[in-house]
Structures are given as C-alpha cells and as structure tokens.
UniProtKB/Swiss-Prot annotation:
As part of the BLOC-one-related complex (BORC), it plays a role in the movement and localization of lysosomes at the cell periphery. Associated with the cytosolic face of lysosomes, BORC recruits ARL8B to the lysosomal membrane and couples lysosomes to microtubule plus-end-directed kinesin motors, driving lysosome movement toward the cell periphery. InterPro entries: BORCS8 (IPR019320). GO terms for cellular component: BORC complex; cytoplasmic side of lysosomal membrane. This is BLOC-1-related complex subunit 8. Residues 101-120 are annotated as: Disordered. The gene is Borcs8. PANTHER family: BLOC-1-RELATED COMPLEX SUBUNIT 8, MEF2B PROTEIN. The keyword Membrane applies. The modification Phosphoserine is found at residue 109. The lineage of its organism: Eukaryota, Metazoa, Chordata, Craniata, Vertebrata. It comes from Mus musculus. Its main location: membrane. It comes from the Eukaryota. It is found in: Lysosome membrane. Keywords: Lysosome, Membrane, Phosphoprotein. Component of the BLOC-one-related complex (BORC) which is composed of BLOC1S1, BLOC1S2, BORCS5, BORCS6, BORCS7, BORCS8, KXD1 and SNAPIN.
C-alpha cells in the first residue's frame, strides 16, 4: 500500500518539476515575444514624435537666431547713437552755414540792384 502512494507522490513531484522546467524554458521566449510586440506597436509613434521634436527644434533654432540677430541690430543702433548725434550736429552746422551764405548772397545782390547813392 505504501508503494502506490509513493508512486503517486513521485509522479506529482516529477510532474511539478517537469512543469517548472517547461515554464522556465519557455518564459524568456514569451517575454521576448511580448517585448517584440510592444516595440512593433510603439516604434512608429515614437519615430513620429522624434521627427516632430526635430522639426520643432529646427524651428526654435531659427527663431532664436532671428531674435539674437534683432537684439544685435538694436544694440548696434544704441551703440551708434554717438555717431547719430555727431551727424545731427554737423547737419545743424551745415544748415547754419547755408543760411549765413544765403543771407550774405542776398545782401550782395541787393547792393547790385540798388542804385548807387547820388553824389549830390
């Protein structure tokens, strides 16, 4: 009577052992299959996100370059205000000289047009 009971226990142990070996042998392949499925599903979306991010980065770099260029231009204008003031002063001086020359020319033309004082 003990022998059939021992055989039953031995069979249970070997069945459990065989099942464990089978699960361990197949588990990595199932995990790799699931991983492969996940990658196949996710990869196109990730590739699209990557392309979008690269496009946004290029647009951002262009905008940053434009802003930096504009800031540089404004700074150059601010720095050149000294030259603008100098040009303004020279223009005022030129206008003053022109007005003085016009006044002098009008005075000479009036002398020519007016009759000489009579010698009486």
């Amino acid at each position: 009577m003990e022998e059939p009971e021992m055989q039953l226990k031995g069979k249970k142990v070997t069945d459990k052992f065989t099942e464990s070996v089978y699960v361990l042998a197949n588990e990595p392949s199932v995990a790799l299959y699931r991983l492969q499925e996940h990658v196949r599903r996710s990869l196109p979306e990730l590739a699209q996100h990557k392309a979008d991010m690269q496009r946004w980065e290029e647009q951002s770099q262009g905008a940053i370059y434009t802003v930096e260029y504009a800031c540089s231009a404004v700074k150059s204008l601010v720095d050149s205000s000294v030259y603008f003031r100098s040009v303004e002063g020279l223009l005022k001086q030129a206008i003053s000289i022109r007005d003085h020359m016009n006044t002098s020319a009008q005075g000479h033309s009036q002398e020519k047009l007016s009759p000489p004082p009579s010698l009486a």
